[in-house]
């Protein structure tokens, strides 16, 4: 007898254990985890006849297939690279949607294993902080990945520390905060913003604190937003306004890849309304692996990092790649984010005290994805996939919005089939 729920759990455990090395030594680990989860979902559909439960995932696949056809007619890249991009773009959706349906439940042993891996990850980060030459030149591991490793490890540790009543022990909360502090060593403005939000949700947030629109709540919210803005401003200015200079220079955008990507993505949304320029055409790995003709059309093929001879900065941020899907794609992506977060809000309404930390974890995972996507393709990488998986674990605990068939209830917590 094969238990699909346990295969899902151990797939996530292996992915979590290799997370810190997926930026250098074991890069295929995110593909391995994603394809394994997709195979589990397909097996669940075929063996347990649960096609209806996977309708959201099937809808995403159908939309992506439609974009493959559309992109072929647009003609900015060849079919193999269009298909490659479609597969890559599917990756963030698979962990959340498969886990949401299979609903794996962590037992005590699995929680201990995950907490142990989280601690090992933090120790490894500290060691790599102390070995900059080995880290930067031998492993070629960017400091950004150490910060994201700490943040995801913190979320996993917190999730595994919640007891049946929804409480987290003082010792575990201390460990969570220590993990958060260790991540500050990455010296990344994005992480500082995430850390400010994490401190707010972990130490200050209380369910229902916004009821009655109390002035204190709005003042606290404003202070958090100001703090996030302050710790993030230098990097925002560097990437989008001044570049290497000390003052705002309107001409500097022509010599820096990321501002050009963002500016051009806006033009593409207007010029290729409403469905965008198509897959493998802009700001994606496939559009750099086989250089897209769209870069010539917009005259950005000579920008440093965006040229055909040196395309290393093309796949540098997630949001510009949404221009490939047009206004329709942007609306669909926002709709997905809202839909994915709704189960966490249902949990909070169901039992605010028991599910407070589940809501916090989902909120922080969402914030992590949104912030990291500004200047990286994190949703497509191991850290982003694990963030989506964590949101899936939280969402799987929420009650369904409507009654399900008895056969589905029977399969909720134990997904099996006989060999």
Predicted regions: what is each one?
Residues 359-419:
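Transmembrane alpha-helices of multi-pass inner-membrane enzymes
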Residues 19-33, 136-145, 170-208, 229-235, ...:
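Helix-loop-helix junctions and helix-breaking kinks within/between transmembrane helices
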Residues 31-38, 56-70, 77-101, 116-118, ...:
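Aromatic-anchored transmembrane helix interface
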Residues 281-318:
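Interfacial juxtamembrane loops and adjacent helix segments
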Residues 324-367:
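Hydrophobic transmembrane alpha-helices and their immediate junctions
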Residues 95-135, 141-206:
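Alpha-helical transmembrane segments of multi-pass inner-membrane proteins
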Residues 1-69, 104, 108, 160-170, ...:
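Transmembrane signal-anchor hairpin modules in multi-pass inner-membrane enzymes, especially those
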Residues 181-186, 203-249, 267:
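A membrane-periplasm/extracellular boundary helix in multi-pass inner-membrane enzymes
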